[in-house]
């Protein structure tokens, strides 16, 4: 008998509840990479908040294939969904979930008609490669849908899943004196998260077994599933190039200068040869593209240099598996910092990406050693950020930046405790997301 997957709380549940209660609610599109928990959270949301759930997997349900083939008559569609699922659909009482919606001909386009003619019904759709469908010409119901994006579990959600909600709350409320007294525990949890990452199946395996090797097997299966998606769903002429970019990511991040270099992918490679491959990985939700800015002024977007960027993997646990980092190297403290900087940056990037209300860039200038790992725009604030893998508090670039921009406050994430000194706030790595939540 397979062990039962335990329920793991996700922050996005509150966003789903808010969507349910909106007076101007439209059909919901839930975006996110494969295996981040979209289906799971929608079903749990339905069970908690509705009397009934009508769930259809559009990929493997033959009866659903022609659901929208003839017309968009909502009464007929609702009757058919009810017949397929065995659920008597009632407005306000039933959550309709159409999973893998991109597999249905005209499936996404149908949401326009749900919005215009049946807004009293709660309709939510998801799909493993829905981001690709939306960017590759699939008819998109502009202005007729609400969207949410789901990410791998954050470090805080990892604590919550393991039964340490109080420790999560301390980080979210910035109770740094108490956090400091629990420093050893937080560092242990962080190193475990470095190993496990935030893919729900890997987290659940860790909770069930406490076995690093079992977790790594799950991660390797997820990576293989992503690579199968590339072979199956990517344009045939792009498959080789997508795989080349994908496989180069650990090497790209291991460089001292983590700017994406096409020559690392293939000797003599040029941007125009790989732009579509990179965009495919972004649209699939597998990588985060962080562009460079040359000036730290509001809004950061107008200072973006689209020709210079870094690519980070969607999950630090998967990066560890792709990089073949021995689990013990992630779990145990070490004086050897080889590989730690890139890994820690990827961790921070993932935590930042889960905060949808901030914009993320990095800062550097040609012919200069001054570089900032990240620059964040949160509301009316521009925040320069440096990331340190351990307790090293030297921050030459950060200090030079705040000296150049009077009034600007620097932010450093490291293994050291919370402190404010000389215009720089040091936040422990395990408190990165919780600290930035106070800005949004």
Where are these regions (language model features)?
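N-terminal pre-Walker A segment at the start of P-loop NTPase domains
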Residues: 1-21
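Interdomain motor-coupling "hinge/lid" segment immediately C-terminal to the ATP-binding subdomain
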Residues: 2, 134-254
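Conserved lysine of the Walker
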Residues: 38
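Hydrophobic positions on the alpha1 helix immediately C-terminal to the Walker A/P-loop
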Residues: 41, 45
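Short glycine-rich substrate-engagement loop in P-loop NTPases that contacts/grips substrate
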Residues: 60-91
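Structural recognition of the conserved hydrophobic beta-strand(s) that form the central parallel beta-sheet
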Residues: 97, 122-128, 149
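Accessory nucleic acid-recognition modules appended to NTPase machines
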Residues: 207-371, 376-378
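Conserved catalytic cores of phosphodiester-cleaving nucleases, focusing on short active-site segments
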Residues: 352, 372-391, 410
């Amino acid at each position: 008998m397979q062990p039962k997957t335990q329920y793991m709380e996700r922050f996005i549940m509150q966003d789903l509840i808010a969507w349910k209660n909106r007076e101007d609610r439209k059909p919901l599109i839930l975006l996110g990479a494969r295996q981040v928990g979209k289906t799971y959270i929608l079903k749990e949301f339905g069970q908690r908040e509705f009397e009934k759930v009508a769930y259809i997997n559009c990929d493997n349900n033959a009866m659903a294939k022609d659901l929208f083939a003839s017309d968009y008559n909502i009464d007929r569609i609702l009757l058919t969904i009810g017949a397929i699922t065995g659920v008597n659909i009632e407005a306000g009482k039933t959550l309709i979930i159409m999973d893998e919606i991109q597999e249905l001909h005209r499936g996404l386009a149908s949401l326009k008609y749900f919005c215009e003619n049946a807004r009293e019904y709660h309709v939510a759709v998801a799909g493993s490669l829905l981001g690709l469908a939306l960017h590759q010409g699939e008819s998109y119901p502009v202005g007729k849908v609400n969207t949410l994006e789901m990410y791998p579990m954050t470090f805080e959600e990892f604590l919550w899943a393991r039964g340490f909600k109080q420790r999560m709350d301390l980080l979210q409320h910035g109770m740094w004196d108490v956090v400091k007294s629990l420093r050893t525990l937080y560092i242990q949890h962080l190193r475990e998260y470095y190993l496990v990452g935030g893919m729900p199946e890997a987290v659940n395996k860790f909770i069930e077994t406490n076995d690093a090797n079992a977790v790594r097997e799950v991660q390797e299966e997820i990576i293989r599933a992503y690579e199968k998606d590339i072979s199956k769903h990517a344009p045939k002429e792009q498959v080789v190039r997508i795989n080349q970019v994908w496989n180069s990511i650990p090497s790209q991040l291991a460089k001292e200068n983590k700017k994406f270099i096409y020559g690392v992918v293939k000797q003599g490679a040029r941007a125009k040869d790989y732009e579509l491959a990179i965009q495919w990985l972004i649209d699939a939700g597998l990588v985060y593209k962080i562009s460079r800015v040359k000036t730290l002024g509001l809004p950061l977007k107008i200072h973006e240099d689209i020709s210079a960027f870094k690519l980070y993997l969607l999950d630090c646990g998967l990066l560890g598996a792709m990089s073949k980092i021995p689990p013990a190297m992630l779990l145990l403290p070490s004086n050897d910092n080889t590989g730690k900087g890139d890994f820690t940056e990827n961790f921070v990037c993932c935590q930042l990406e889960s905060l949808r209300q901030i914009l993320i860039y990095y800062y550097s200038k040609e012919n200069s050693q001054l570089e900032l790992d990240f620059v964040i725009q949160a509301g009316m604030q521009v925040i320069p950020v440096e990331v340190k893998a351990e307790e090293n508090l030297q921050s030459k670039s950060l200090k030079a930046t705040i000296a150049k921009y009077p009034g600007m406050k620097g932010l450093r994430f490291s293994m050291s405790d919370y402190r404010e000194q000389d215009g720089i706030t040091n936040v422990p790595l395990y408190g990165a997301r919780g600290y930035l939540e106070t800005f949004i």
